[in-house]
Amino acid sequence: MALVNENYLKLPGSYLFSEIARRVNQFKKANPEADIIRLGIGDVTRPLVPAVVEAMKKAVDEMGRAETFRGYGPEQGYDFLIGQIIENDYKPRGIDLGMDEVFVSDGSKCDTANFQEILGIGNIVAVTDPVYPVYVDSNVMAGRSGAFNEKGQFDDIVYLPCTEANGMKPELPKTRVDMIYLCFPNNPTGMTLTKEELKQWVDYARENKSIILYDAAYEAFIQEAHIPRSIYEIEGAREVAVEFRSFSKTAGFTGTRCAFTVVPKEVMAYDREGRAYSLNGLWLRRQTTKFNGVSYPVQAAAAAIYTEAGKKQVKETIEYYMENARIIREGLVEAGYKVFGGVNAPYIWLKTPDNMSSWDFFDKLISVANVVGTPGAGFGASGEGYFRLTAFGTRENTVKALERIRTRM
C-alpha cells in the first residue's frame, strides 16, 4: 500500500491565487459582460524590453546552428550571466561575491520553496504575518509546521505580526528561531526596512546561529536611497543570510523564468554535534541533483538586462509601474482609505473600510467595481481586514480601476 505524504493533507484547500481565480471565473460566468480589471496576482503587463528580445532571438539563432549549438548548460548558471549579476547588482554597493556564490534558477518562488530542503526538519521556522504563502506552505510540506489551528496558523511556526501598531514591520522573535523568512520590499504590504532595522535581524541571527532567508525579489523598485537593496549591505550578513532575487517583476520575466540565489560560503548550518557545514556546497549538491539549469536563450536574455540599452529600458518599465503605484496610493488616500506601501514597492496594502473582512471586500470590489485584488487574509491571520492591490496593470486600467473605486465603493 503506497502511503501519502500526510504533511500535504495539512495544507489549506487551495493555493490563495487559485482560489481567487476560481471566484473570478465564477463571477465572469454569472456576469459575462462585466469589464473586469485585475489588480490582484502580481503578474506584469509590460512586454520584454527590446534589448532582451534581441538577445533572446540571437541566442535562439545560435541554437539553430551546429557550430554554436549548446546542450546541457551548467546547473549553477552560465558565467556570462553570473559575472554581470555580480558586477552590476553587488559590486557598486561594496559587496564582493565569488562566481560560485551565485546560483541562476528559473524563479525565486522555486528557490524560496526549495531551499528549506537542505535544512533540518527540526528547525523552528519564523515568518512575518502577513506572509507570501510559499514560505509557509513549503515548510508544511516538509513537516516543520505542526497542526493547523483555529486561528488559521500552524502550531510549530512562529508568526511575527506586522500590524498598524508596529508600522507593518516585524519585531524580533521573543524566543529562539532557526530559519527566518524576510521579504523586503515586502510582499504583500509594500513596506521596507532601513539599514538599522535590518541590522537588528542580522545581529539576532548571528547571536542565535539562525539563518535568514531573504527574499529581495522587488529590490529594483526601491526609490529611496537610504533603503538597503541587499541584505549584504549589513555587516555580518554574509555569515547568516541567503538572498533570493528575480528578473520576473524587474524585467518582465514572469513568463520567461529567470532568477538567482546568493549563498555565501560563510553561511553555515550545524549537525547535532555542533559541526558546521557550508550551505553553499549543500545547495550546489541539491541543484546538481534536482535541477538542470535555465536554458541558454533565457540566460542570454537576462544578461541583456545589464547592457547600457537594457538598463535604460528596464528602468523605464520600473518607472511605469511605480507611477501606477503612485496613482493607486494617492487615489486611495483621497478616497479615505488607510494605505501602506507603494513608495518603494509595486504593492499597496489598504485597510478595508468599516471592519469589513478581506474576502467580503474582495466580493464587494469585484461585484460593485469589477476590480480584482487580493484579500489580506490569504497572506495570514494578521492580513485579515486588509487588501492588496498591485501596480502591474496597464496605465489605462490602473486609472480606470481607481476611478471606479472612488465613485462606486
Curated annotation (Swiss-Prot):
Its EC number is 2.6.1.83. Pyridoxal 5'-phosphate binds at Y72, S108, K109, Y132, N187, Y218, S246, F247, S248, R257, N292. GO terms for molecular function: L,L-diaminopimelate aminotransferase activity; pyridoxal phosphate binding. Keywords: Aminotransferase, Pyridoxal phosphate, Transferase. The keyword Transferase applies. GO terms for biological process: lysine biosynthetic process via diaminopimelate, diaminopimelate-aminotransferase pathway. It catalyses: (2S,6S)-2,6-diaminopimelate + 2-oxoglutarate = (S)-2,3,4,5-tetrahydrodipicolinate + L-glutamate + H2O + H(+). Substrate binds at Y15, G42, K109, Y132, N187, N292, R388. The keyword Iron does not apply. The modification N6-(pyridoxal phosphate)lysine is found at K249. Pathway: Amino-acid biosynthesis; L-lysine biosynthesis via DAP pathway; LL-2,6-diaminopimelate from (S)-tetrahydrodipicolinate (aminotransferase route): step 1/1. Its cofactor is pyridoxal 5'-phosphate. Belongs to the class-I pyridoxal-phosphate-dependent aminotransferase family. LL-diaminopimelate aminotransferase subfamily. Involved in the synthesis of meso-diaminopimelate (m-DAP or DL-DAP), required for both lysine and peptidoglycan biosynthesis. Catalyzes the direct conversion of tetrahydrodipicolinate to LL-diaminopimelate. This is LL-diaminopimelate aminotransferase.
